[in-house]
Amino acid sequence: MSQPKILLLGAPGAGKGTQSSNIVDEYGVDHITTGDALRANKDMETEHGTPREFMEAGELVPDPVVNEIVQAAIDEADGFVLDGYPRNLSQAEYLSDITDVDVVALLDVGRDELVDRLTGRRMDPETGDIYHTEFNMPDDEEVRERLVQRDDDTEETVNERLDVFDENTQPVIDYYEDEGELVRIDGEASPDEVWDDLQAAIDDAL
């Protein structure tokens, strides 16, 4: 049996990274993120230029370039979990043209919970380690005292990021829901409970 092809949707802070790692460990598939794929293939020639040209200019990499890069990663993978793609409806339609996925799972988390999760993050500037004020603070008092909040984790910036996600990705969610493919997972449960539900959805689809 071929390895599963899994699409994991969810807002920033929904827990996609944690659950993607669980999927990789359990099913032995590749973890494909847009950012990693672009960085790994930044010099890949496409009809519209290389990712590097846009990244170095501080511009968003256009959809046709992102699509080609992600397709290359999918073609090389024996099963995958896609995390952070598709980000908009045109990418979702492109993905449907190039491959079939077994599971489309949405980690469903409310706005207030997302804001709490993201604004509570703290970073150790010396190590880059990430902590959280509510459920993951370091034991070492010296480390606790030097923790900082990153600029992109302030409440204003978090809400802006979530607004952008809603605007771009809600049509993607609607697209898969209309196709009858979307499985909603309660992302506000504990990470272990989320994983139990997600694994059950994957196993049910295979």
Curated annotation (Swiss-Prot):
SUPFAM superfamilies: P-loop containing nucleoside triphosphate hydrolases
EC number per UniProt: 2.7.4.3
PROSITE patterns: ADENYLATE_KINASE
GO CC annotation terms, alphabetical: cytoplasm
Chain segments carrying region LID: 120-153
Residues that hold ATP according to the record: G13, A14, G15, K16, G17, T18, R121, I130, Y131, A189
Molecular function, one GO term: ATP binding
Subunit comment: Monomer.
Entry's free-text remark on domains: Consists of three domains, a large central CORE domain and two small peripheral domains, NMPbind and LID, which undergo movements during catalysis. The LID domain closes over the site of phosphoryl transfer upon ATP binding. Assembling and dissambling the active center during each catalytic cycle provides an effective means to prevent ATP hydrolysis.
Protein name: Adenylate kinase
The organism of origin for this protein: Natronomonas pharaonis (strain ATCC 35678 / DSM 2160 / CIP 103997 / JCM 8858 / NBRC 14720 / NCIMB 2260 / Gabara) (Halobacterium pharaonis)
